[in-house]
Amino acid sequence: MSNFLYANDSRATYPLSWYAQSSGDTPLRAALDQPVSSDVCIIGAGFTGLSTALHLAQKGFSVTVLEAHRVGFGASGRNGGQMGSGFNQDQRKLEKTMGQDAAHRLWEMTQDAKSLTRSLITQFAPEADYQPGIAEADFSPKDRDNSHAKAAHLEKNYGYGEMECLDTSTISDLIKSPRYSGGLIDWGAGHLHPLRYALGLAKAAETAGAIIYEDSPVLQVQEGSPNILQTDRGQVKANYVVHATNGYHCSLNRKQATRVMPINNFLVATAPLENPQSVLTKNIAVADNRFVLNYYRISDDNRLIFGGGESYGTKFPQDIFTKVRHPLTEIFPQLANIDLTHAWGGTLGITTTRLPMFARVGHQQLTASGYSGHGVALAGFAGLVLAETIAGNAARFDLLSKLPGPAFPGGQLLR
């Protein structure tokens, strides 16, 4: 069992995040404590697993979801809440890797992913409060010019005209920071409360007939007909298995473990701001172009939710407040003395190419993971694609499975 599941968190308990505090009372679901059988067993109740469960249940499959902790416990319920466009790789580079035809089909899938996310929120989680707009903030004029060229390329070659280019003056009007030289706003992207979205998906999946067990970590998957999944107190026999664990993959499957690396990211929430427009003048999210990027937005109760800093080890730093305060005050020196009320970390999954991993990893066992920071849209869409595949239509899965993703050097040993 991977230490990532328990190294930084108490069992079956949400982290002390602003997201958890602002999501209301969420009673713990029952743990699996007996043998059960279903058509499909899904490991993990994040966006991928919950969307897969919902779409399979709507198709009439019997579905069991096993979650080691709580619904939305992992990256799905801890992230910056930003639903970006495309993959975490420039579309121009993807064209060179995959060819023009495949690149265009993949872009359309990422557009479908955003549309699906907005639709699921409207139907099942309006309290997630989706708002349009993500700014990409660039530190140097060279990076700004590259962002503008990207926007022009997407409009000319893909008909995507949702990006508004920003120069030094216009980005300074938008983001009250002296650090940026320009960038763009993607009005086709947006931001939301991720844990409320996950909780809404869970209720929708259960209403459709799926059964979700919390506090039910999977210890072993025995491949066969059927596949057998063993928890610490129960067992599931299932024709199909979906590994929807992302960075918390627990090394349950070697193919996934060698290609998807866990990485930790950290966030804080400030006390409510008296004047949020002293930080952001529009209700958008922002991500800058640092390699270890900073990302932020204003919450519905006027807090700055700010993410910055990362680590590759199992343990989080002892003082996340201090770790994140440094980049926060670098970007917003006017907030040097602001009170920080919440601090938390989370573990996501990345790949060598920063493109997601879609793969068949055993007999009637599928996975989608490694969204590399673009999981808010892609993970829910992956659930739809996994459900389509199990139902007999693997066209989109097969194309996504061709995305390049070599194993990390050292394979599983360096995790």
Give the ranges of each region predicted by the language model.
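Short beta-strand to alpha-helix junction loop
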Residues: 108-111, 139-146, 185-203, 213, ...
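Active-site substrate-recognition segment that forms the wall
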Residues: 115, 123-131, 218, 234-274, ...
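Helix-loop-beta segment of a Rossmann-like dinucleotide-binding subdomain
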Residues: 29, 126-136, 170-204, 208, ...
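Glycine-rich FAD pyrophosphate-binding loop
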Residues: 58-78
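N-terminal Rossmann-like FAD-binding beta1-loop-alpha1 element of flavoenzymes
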Residues: 38-65
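Dinucleotide-binding Rossmann-like beta1-alpha1 core, especially the glycine-rich loop
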Residues: 86-169
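Helical element adjacent to the flavin cofactor pocket in flavoenzyme catalytic cores
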Residues: 153, 179-239
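Extreme N-terminal leader/targeting segments of oxidoreductases
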Residues: 1-40
